A protein has these predicted regions:
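Beta-strand-rich domains and repeat architectures in extracellular enzymes and scaffolds
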Residues: 40-79
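Blade-loop segments of beta-propeller domains
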Residues: 49-50, 68, 74-123
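Short, Lys/Arg-rich N-terminal segment immediately upstream of the first membrane anchor
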Residues: 1-5
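Asp-box/WD-like beta-propeller blade repeats and closely related beta-sheet repeat scaffolds
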Residues: 99-177, 181-182
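Hydrophobic membrane-insertion alpha-helices, especially the h-region
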Residues: 6-22
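A short helix->beta-strand "capping" segment at the edge of beta-propeller domains
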Residues: 26-47, 86-95
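Alpha-helical membrane-targeting segments
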Residues: 20, 27, 178-185
């Protein structure tokens, strides 16, 4: 066997080992077993529920929900934020953003309480870009405070409020479309 063939075979073997390592390390061949031993209190029908955050102090949950279409979106998706009173065993969701006039497809959400007022931050995916919407929750009603747009917010996924004016957020992709986005997924 010639020297060039040996080098070629070595490169192919290394490449195959690298690809195998990617599949193994990312859990591609792993089997997940459902071991849930709890009970479901009630199924709540919300299309495309994405995130939930709970106020343990005041016993309620806020759920972000958007009927998800295929990616990339061909039309603006419509979603909402929902309030669920955890003290009321009916667990009826109240649509908090039904009167919000902007396109709204929420993703990650976070809440922060100051006094008796909750600030809610929601990632918003629209056809015109990615935004973070800020609301105040007072007596089960939302008031829109502001919209934040920034070049660093290009593929936001989740957010956590540190206070009513400070937060962390994550971008879950570097690329919006094309082969690079496919490779990231």
């Amino acid at each position: 066997m010639t020297f060039k063939k040996r080098i070629l075979y070595a490169v192919i073997i290394l490449l195959l080992l690298y690809v195998a390592n990617i599949f193994i390390s990312t859990g591609y061949f792993r089997t997940i077993t459902n071991n849930f031993e709890g009970s479901i209190l009630q199924k709540i029908k919300l299309p495309g529920a994405e995130d939930i955050t709970i106020s343990q102090i005041d016993s309620f949950a806020i759920v972000s929900s958007t009927k998800r279409n295929k990616f990339p979106n061909k039309t603006q998706e419509t979603g909402g934020l929902y309030f669920i009173d955890l003290k009321n065993k009916a667990y009826q969701p109240i649509h908090l953003t039904k009167n919000f006039k902007k396109p709204f497809a929420p993703h990650g959400i976070s809440i922060f309480k100051t006094g008796s007022v909750y600030t809610i931050a929601a990632i918003n995916h629209t056809e015109k870009g990615e935004f973070i919407e800020f609301f105040q929750l007072i007596n089960k009603k939302l008031k829109h405070i502001k919209t934040l747009k920034n070049e660093l917010i290009f593929s936001p996924n989740d957010i956590v409020l540190l206070d009513e004016n400070s937060f962390y957020f994550t971008n879950d992709h570097k690329y919006k479309q094309g082969i690079q986005r496919l490779a990231e997924d």
